[in-house]
């Protein structure tokens, strides 16, 4: 099942507080970037971010976005300011 345009717009609205966000549509799903660094994606109407020890405090559910993929974390929050904190924390770790 591909991600709906409505869900994509919903997630992009959640990311409105984060600077440098972009996306690329691939095979019906979306890859998410911050300043050209991949931090997550939208798969089957699920907002997922890369697994990281720096995000353990949030206790996100681990999911597999598609067969043979690495485990990712399901972001089920609706607060754009918390989402901003999560993305910025992950970006700092990934851009080292």
At which residue positions do the language-model features occur?
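Charge-dense, helix-prone N-terminal extensions
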Residues: 1-96
